[in-house]
Protein backbone atom coordinates (compact mmCIF):
# COMPACT_ATOMS: atom_id res chain seq x y z
CA UNK A 1 0.00 0.00 0.00
CA UNK A 2 2.81 2.43 0.86
CA UNK A 3 2.69 5.88 2.41
CA UNK A 4 1.13 9.10 1.17
CA UNK A 5 3.97 11.62 1.18
CA UNK A 6 3.59 15.36 1.63
CA UNK A 7 5.96 18.32 1.78
CA UNK A 8 5.00 21.79 2.97
CA UNK A 9 7.75 24.38 3.37
CA UNK A 10 11.21 24.82 1.93
CA UNK A 11 12.92 22.31 -0.35
CA UNK A 12 16.40 23.83 -0.86
CA UNK A 13 17.70 20.99 -3.03
CA UNK A 14 18.58 21.26 -6.71
CA UNK A 15 16.30 24.22 -7.26
CA UNK A 16 17.68 25.02 -10.72
CA UNK A 17 16.56 21.65 -12.09
CA UNK A 18 12.85 20.84 -12.01
CA UNK A 19 13.69 17.15 -12.29
CA UNK A 20 14.98 17.42 -8.71
CA UNK A 21 11.91 19.12 -7.23
CA UNK A 22 9.67 17.39 -4.64
CA UNK A 23 7.08 15.85 -6.97
CA UNK A 24 9.87 14.38 -9.08
CA UNK A 25 11.62 13.04 -5.99
CA UNK A 26 8.83 10.99 -4.45
CA UNK A 27 6.39 13.41 -2.82
CA UNK A 28 2.70 13.22 -3.73
CA UNK A 29 1.86 16.82 -2.74
CA UNK A 30 4.00 19.95 -2.36
CA UNK A 31 3.36 23.52 -1.27
CA UNK A 32 6.27 25.79 -0.44
CA UNK A 33 9.43 27.40 -1.78
CA UNK A 34 12.08 25.59 -3.78
CA UNK A 35 14.82 27.84 -2.39
CA UNK A 36 16.04 27.92 1.20
CA UNK A 37 14.20 31.08 2.25
CA UNK A 38 11.72 33.68 1.07
CA UNK A 39 9.79 36.68 2.31
CA UNK A 40 7.26 35.67 4.95
CA UNK A 41 4.42 38.05 4.10
CA UNK A 42 4.82 38.50 0.35
CA UNK A 43 6.82 35.64 -1.17
CA UNK A 44 5.00 36.17 -4.47
CA UNK A 45 6.84 39.51 -4.86
CA UNK A 46 10.29 37.94 -4.44
CA UNK A 47 11.71 37.69 -7.95
CA UNK A 48 14.89 35.83 -7.04
CA UNK A 49 15.01 32.38 -8.62
CA UNK A 50 13.09 29.78 -6.63
CA UNK A 51 12.19 32.22 -3.85
CA UNK A 52 8.50 32.37 -4.65
CA UNK A 53 5.80 29.90 -3.59
CA UNK A 54 4.96 26.78 -5.60
CA UNK A 55 1.99 24.46 -5.48
CA UNK A 56 3.27 21.23 -6.97
CA UNK A 57 5.40 22.32 -9.91
CA UNK A 58 3.43 25.50 -10.59
CA UNK A 59 4.31 28.96 -9.26
CA UNK A 60 1.68 30.68 -7.13
CA UNK A 61 1.34 34.11 -8.75
CA UNK A 62 -0.73 35.59 -5.92
CA UNK A 63 -0.64 34.10 -2.42
CA UNK A 64 -3.84 33.98 -0.36
CA UNK A 65 -3.99 33.98 3.42
CA UNK A 66 -5.20 30.77 5.04
CA UNK A 67 -6.04 32.56 8.32
CA UNK A 68 -7.90 35.66 9.49
CA UNK A 69 -4.67 37.66 9.45
CA UNK A 70 -2.17 38.57 6.73
CA UNK A 71 -0.57 35.82 4.65
CA UNK A 72 2.47 34.44 6.46
CA UNK A 73 4.44 31.44 5.28
CA UNK A 74 4.54 29.63 8.64
CA UNK A 75 0.73 29.76 8.79
CA UNK A 76 0.34 28.81 5.13
CA UNK A 77 2.76 25.87 5.25
CA UNK A 78 0.92 24.43 8.24
CA UNK A 79 -2.56 24.90 6.78
CA UNK A 80 -1.59 23.30 3.47
CA UNK A 81 -0.01 20.39 5.35
CA UNK A 82 -3.29 19.93 7.23
CA UNK A 83 -5.20 20.02 3.94
CA UNK A 84 -2.94 17.31 2.54
CA UNK A 85 -3.62 15.09 5.56
CA UNK A 86 -7.37 15.67 5.48
CA UNK A 87 -7.68 15.04 1.74
CA UNK A 88 -5.46 11.94 1.72
CA UNK A 89 -6.46 8.30 1.59
CA UNK A 90 -7.49 7.44 5.15
CA UNK A 91 -6.54 3.80 4.57
CA UNK A 92 -2.90 4.74 3.97
CA UNK A 93 -0.38 6.00 6.54
CA UNK A 94 1.25 9.32 5.69
CA UNK A 95 4.71 10.86 5.80
CA UNK A 96 4.67 14.64 6.23
CA UNK A 97 7.78 16.79 5.94
CA UNK A 98 6.79 20.20 7.33
CA UNK A 99 9.86 22.32 6.69
CA UNK A 100 9.40 25.83 8.07
CA UNK A 101 11.64 28.62 6.84
CA UNK A 102 11.32 30.39 10.22
CA UNK A 103 13.35 31.59 12.00
CA UNK A 104 15.69 31.92 9.01
CA UNK A 105 16.19 35.47 7.74
CA UNK A 106 14.49 37.66 6.64
CA UNK A 107 13.31 38.28 10.19
CA UNK A 108 9.62 39.16 9.83
CA UNK A 109 6.67 38.37 12.07
CA UNK A 110 3.08 39.24 12.88
CA UNK A 111 3.10 42.44 14.94
CA UNK A 112 0.79 40.98 17.60
CA UNK A 113 3.40 38.25 18.14
CA UNK A 114 6.26 40.78 18.21
CA UNK A 115 4.44 42.83 20.84
CA UNK A 116 4.53 39.86 23.24
CA UNK A 117 8.32 40.12 23.42
CA UNK A 118 9.04 43.86 23.22
CA UNK A 119 11.05 44.86 26.26
CA UNK A 120 11.89 41.31 27.34
CA UNK A 121 15.45 41.58 26.03
CA UNK A 122 16.41 45.00 27.43
CA UNK A 123 18.57 43.28 30.05
CA UNK A 124 20.93 42.57 27.17
CA UNK A 125 22.85 39.56 25.93
CA UNK A 126 25.47 39.56 28.70
CA UNK A 127 22.94 39.19 31.53
CA UNK A 128 20.55 36.95 29.59
CA UNK A 129 23.32 34.51 28.64
CA UNK A 130 24.11 34.07 32.34
CA UNK A 131 20.43 33.64 33.23
CA UNK A 132 19.90 31.03 30.49
CA UNK A 133 23.00 29.11 31.49
CA UNK A 134 21.91 29.04 35.13
CA UNK A 135 18.46 27.78 34.15
CA UNK A 136 19.94 25.11 31.88
CA UNK A 137 22.06 23.81 34.74
CA UNK A 138 19.15 23.89 37.20
CA UNK A 139 17.03 21.83 34.80
CA UNK A 140 19.81 19.29 34.39
CA UNK A 141 20.04 19.90 30.65
CA UNK A 142 23.83 19.70 30.91
CA UNK A 143 25.97 17.69 33.27
CA UNK A 144 27.77 19.37 36.13
CA UNK A 145 30.81 21.32 34.97
CA UNK A 146 29.36 22.72 31.73
CA UNK A 147 30.74 26.25 31.55
CA UNK A 148 29.43 29.29 29.70
CA UNK A 149 31.50 30.26 26.67
CA UNK A 150 32.92 33.82 26.56
CA UNK A 151 31.02 36.54 24.75
CA UNK A 152 31.90 36.58 21.05
CA UNK A 153 34.84 38.95 20.58
CA UNK A 154 32.98 40.69 17.72
CA UNK A 155 30.09 41.57 20.04
CA UNK A 156 30.30 44.67 22.27
CA UNK A 157 29.28 44.62 25.91
CA UNK A 158 25.59 45.49 26.25
CA UNK A 159 26.43 48.30 28.68
CA UNK A 160 28.42 50.14 25.98
CA UNK A 161 25.32 50.66 23.80
CA UNK A 162 23.25 53.82 24.17
CA UNK A 163 19.56 53.49 25.06
CA UNK A 164 18.31 53.89 21.50
CA UNK A 165 20.61 51.15 20.24
CA UNK A 166 19.53 48.89 23.10
CA UNK A 167 15.88 49.44 22.14
CA UNK A 168 16.70 48.59 18.52
CA UNK A 169 18.45 45.40 19.55
CA UNK A 170 15.55 44.48 21.84
CA UNK A 171 13.23 44.81 18.84
CA UNK A 172 15.49 42.66 16.65
CA UNK A 173 15.36 39.85 19.19
CA UNK A 174 11.62 40.33 19.74
CA UNK A 175 10.97 39.76 16.04
CA UNK A 176 13.08 36.60 16.13
CA UNK A 177 11.23 35.34 19.22
CA UNK A 178 7.90 36.10 17.54
CA UNK A 179 8.86 33.93 14.57
CA UNK A 180 9.46 30.99 16.90
CA UNK A 181 6.24 31.76 18.79
CA UNK A 182 4.36 31.43 15.49
CA UNK A 183 5.96 28.04 14.88
CA UNK A 184 4.74 26.98 18.32
CA UNK A 185 1.22 28.14 17.51
CA UNK A 186 1.20 26.23 14.25
CA UNK A 187 2.65 23.02 15.62
CA UNK A 188 -0.12 23.17 18.20
CA UNK A 189 -2.68 23.59 15.42
CA UNK A 190 -1.34 20.52 13.61
CA UNK A 191 -1.33 18.41 16.77
CA UNK A 192 -4.94 19.42 17.45
CA UNK A 193 -5.92 18.09 14.02
CA UNK A 194 -4.11 14.80 14.63
CA UNK A 195 -5.87 14.39 17.98
CA UNK A 196 -9.26 15.18 16.46
CA UNK A 197 -8.64 12.57 13.75
CA UNK A 198 -7.49 10.07 16.41
CA UNK A 199 -4.06 9.84 14.77
CA UNK A 200 -2.00 11.52 17.47
CA UNK A 201 -1.14 8.47 19.59
CA UNK A 202 0.32 6.45 16.73
CA UNK A 203 1.99 9.25 14.78
CA UNK A 204 5.73 9.60 15.27
CA UNK A 205 6.67 13.29 15.36
CA UNK A 206 10.28 14.34 14.89
CA UNK A 207 11.00 18.00 15.64
CA UNK A 208 14.46 19.31 14.83
CA UNK A 209 16.42 22.21 13.42
CA UNK A 210 19.10 21.98 10.76
CA UNK A 211 21.82 24.11 12.38
CA UNK A 212 22.68 26.37 15.26
CA UNK A 213 21.98 30.08 15.54
CA UNK A 214 22.81 32.25 12.52
CA UNK A 215 25.43 34.99 13.00
CA UNK A 216 25.64 36.09 9.37
CA UNK A 217 26.15 39.78 8.60
CA UNK A 218 27.20 42.55 11.01
CA UNK A 219 27.45 41.64 14.69
CA UNK A 220 24.53 43.94 15.59
CA UNK A 221 22.27 42.73 12.82
CA UNK A 222 21.45 43.94 9.34
CA UNK A 223 18.52 45.39 7.46
CA UNK A 224 15.45 47.43 8.36
CA UNK A 225 13.83 46.76 11.71
CA UNK A 226 11.86 49.88 12.78
CA UNK A 227 9.70 50.58 9.71
CA UNK A 228 7.29 47.64 9.65
CA UNK A 229 6.38 47.93 5.96
CA UNK A 230 10.02 48.12 4.88
CA UNK A 231 11.01 45.35 7.31
CA UNK A 232 8.49 42.99 5.76
CA UNK A 233 9.89 43.63 2.27
CA UNK A 234 13.48 42.87 3.30
CA UNK A 235 15.19 39.77 1.95
CA UNK A 236 17.96 39.21 4.52
CA UNK A 237 17.46 41.29 7.69
CA UNK A 238 18.54 39.47 10.84
CA UNK A 239 19.72 39.84 14.46
CA UNK A 240 23.48 39.32 14.09
CA UNK A 241 26.10 37.56 16.19
CA UNK A 242 25.09 39.55 19.27
CA UNK A 243 21.82 37.66 19.70
CA UNK A 244 23.04 34.50 17.98
CA UNK A 245 25.58 34.28 20.80
CA UNK A 246 22.65 34.25 23.24
CA UNK A 247 20.75 31.67 21.17
CA UNK A 248 23.79 29.36 21.26
CA UNK A 249 24.12 29.46 25.08
CA UNK A 250 26.31 27.93 26.48
CA UNK A 251 28.21 26.93 23.34
CA UNK A 252 30.73 28.51 20.98
CA UNK A 253 30.13 29.60 17.39
CA UNK A 254 27.14 29.26 15.09
CA UNK A 255 25.62 27.98 11.87
CA UNK A 256 28.30 26.95 9.31
CA UNK A 257 30.63 25.69 12.07
CA UNK A 258 30.87 22.22 13.59
CA UNK A 259 31.52 23.46 17.11
CA UNK A 260 28.61 22.79 19.47
CA UNK A 261 27.04 26.19 18.75
CA UNK A 262 26.61 25.18 15.13
CA UNK A 263 25.91 21.47 15.37
CA UNK A 264 24.30 20.69 18.75
CA UNK A 265 20.68 21.48 17.99
CA UNK A 266 17.22 20.74 19.44
CA UNK A 267 15.80 17.38 18.38
CA UNK A 268 13.04 15.35 19.98
CA UNK A 269 10.84 12.42 19.01
CA UNK A 270 7.26 12.07 20.24
CA UNK A 271 5.35 8.81 19.73
CA UNK A 272 2.95 7.86 22.56
CA UNK A 273 2.28 4.39 21.17
CA UNK A 274 5.93 3.47 20.86
CA UNK A 275 8.09 5.49 23.27
CA UNK A 276 8.13 4.73 26.96
CA UNK A 277 7.92 7.83 29.21
CA UNK A 278 11.18 8.45 31.07
CA UNK A 279 11.87 10.43 34.23
CA UNK A 280 15.59 11.04 33.81
CA UNK A 281 17.72 12.80 31.21
CA UNK A 282 18.88 10.51 28.41
CA UNK A 283 22.41 11.41 27.31
CA UNK A 284 23.41 9.15 24.41
CA UNK A 285 24.51 11.11 21.35
CA UNK A 286 22.58 11.04 18.08
CA UNK A 287 23.25 12.32 14.59
CA UNK A 288 20.97 13.21 11.69
CA UNK A 289 22.04 10.13 9.74
CA UNK A 290 20.43 8.04 12.51
CA UNK A 291 16.92 9.19 11.56
CA UNK A 292 16.59 7.04 8.42
CA UNK A 293 17.61 3.74 10.08
CA UNK A 294 15.23 4.57 12.93
CA UNK A 295 12.27 5.10 10.61
CA UNK A 296 13.05 1.92 8.68
CA UNK A 297 13.07 -0.13 11.87
CA UNK A 298 9.87 1.42 13.20
CA UNK A 299 8.10 0.74 9.89
CA UNK A 300 9.43 -2.80 9.68
CA UNK A 301 11.32 -2.16 6.45
CA UNK A 302 14.60 -3.86 5.61
CA UNK A 303 17.14 -1.65 3.83
CA UNK A 304 17.91 -3.31 0.46
CA UNK A 305 21.38 -4.08 -0.82
CA UNK A 306 20.40 -3.00 -4.34
CA UNK A 307 17.70 -1.09 -6.21
CA UNK A 308 16.93 -1.30 -9.94
CA UNK A 309 20.18 -3.18 -10.61
CA UNK A 310 22.24 -0.62 -8.67
CA UNK A 311 24.18 -1.58 -5.57
CA UNK A 312 23.30 0.68 -2.66
CA UNK A 313 25.79 2.02 -0.14
CA UNK A 314 25.17 0.67 3.37
CA UNK A 315 23.51 2.92 5.91
CA UNK A 316 25.98 4.87 8.03
CA UNK A 317 23.69 5.70 10.94
CA UNK A 318 22.15 3.52 13.63
CA UNK A 319 18.59 3.11 14.86
CA UNK A 320 17.64 5.30 17.81
CA UNK A 321 14.97 2.83 18.93
CA UNK A 322 16.94 1.64 22.03
CA UNK A 323 16.49 5.15 23.43
CA UNK A 324 12.71 4.67 23.31
CA UNK A 325 13.00 2.37 26.34
CA UNK A 326 15.96 4.11 28.00
CA UNK A 327 18.71 1.84 26.70
CA UNK A 328 22.06 3.30 25.57
CA UNK A 329 22.96 3.59 21.90
CA UNK A 330 25.85 1.43 20.76
CA UNK A 331 28.12 2.61 17.94
CA UNK A 332 30.95 0.62 16.45
CA UNK A 333 32.65 3.74 15.06
CA UNK A 334 33.06 7.42 16.04
CA UNK A 335 30.68 10.02 14.61
CA UNK A 336 32.05 12.21 11.81
CA UNK A 337 30.75 15.24 9.95
CA UNK A 338 32.09 17.89 7.56
CA UNK A 339 30.36 21.08 6.44
CA UNK A 340 31.83 23.99 4.47
CA UNK A 341 35.40 22.98 5.34
CA UNK A 342 34.54 22.64 9.02
CA UNK A 343 34.54 19.17 10.58
CA UNK A 344 34.10 17.20 13.78
CA UNK A 345 34.74 13.75 15.15
CA UNK A 346 32.93 12.53 18.28
CA UNK A 347 34.10 9.46 20.15
CA UNK A 348 32.39 8.91 23.47
CA UNK A 349 32.76 12.01 25.61
CA UNK A 350 35.43 13.51 23.33
CA UNK A 351 34.83 15.86 20.40
CA UNK A 352 37.52 17.00 17.97
CA UNK A 353 36.62 20.05 15.84
CA UNK A 354 38.32 21.55 12.82
CA UNK A 355 37.72 25.07 11.51
CA UNK A 356 38.63 25.74 7.89
CA UNK A 357 40.19 22.33 7.38
Label every model-predicted segment.
Residues 1, 81, 94-100, 176, ...:
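Beta-strand elements within well-structured catalytic alpha/beta cores of enzymes
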Residues 1-6, 25-28, 90-96, 199-205, ...:
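Loop/turn elements at helix/coil->beta-strand transitions in domains of secreted/extracellular proteins
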Residues 3, 13-118, 123, 153-177:
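Formylglycine-dependent
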Residues 7-18, 34-37, 96-108, 148-156, ...:
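Short, solvent-exposed turn/loop segments enriched in Gly/Ser/Thr/Pro and often Arg
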Residues 17-26, 107-109, 192-271:
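Histidine-centered active-site microenvironments of extracellular/periplasmic hydrolases
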Residues 20-29, 33-38, 233-263, 274-284, ...:
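C-terminal cap/loop subdomain of S1 sulfatases and analogous C-terminal strand-loop tails that border
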Residues 58-67, 114-119, 167-173, 231-235, ...:
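Flexible glycine/proline-enriched surface loops and loop-helix/loop-strand junctions
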Residues 121-151:
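Alpha-helical "lid/cap" subdomains adjacent to substrate-binding clefts that gate access
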Amino acid sequence: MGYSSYLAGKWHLGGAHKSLWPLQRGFDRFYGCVAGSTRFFSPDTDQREGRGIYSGNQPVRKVTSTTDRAYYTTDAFTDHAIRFIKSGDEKKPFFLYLSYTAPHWPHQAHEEDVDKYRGKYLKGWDELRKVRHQRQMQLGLFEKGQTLSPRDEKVPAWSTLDLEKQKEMDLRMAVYAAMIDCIDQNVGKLLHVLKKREQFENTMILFLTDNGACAEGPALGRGEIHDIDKRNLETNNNYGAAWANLSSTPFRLYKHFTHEGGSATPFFIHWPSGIKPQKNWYRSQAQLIDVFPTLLEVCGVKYPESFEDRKLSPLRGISLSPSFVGKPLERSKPMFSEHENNAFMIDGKWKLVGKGV
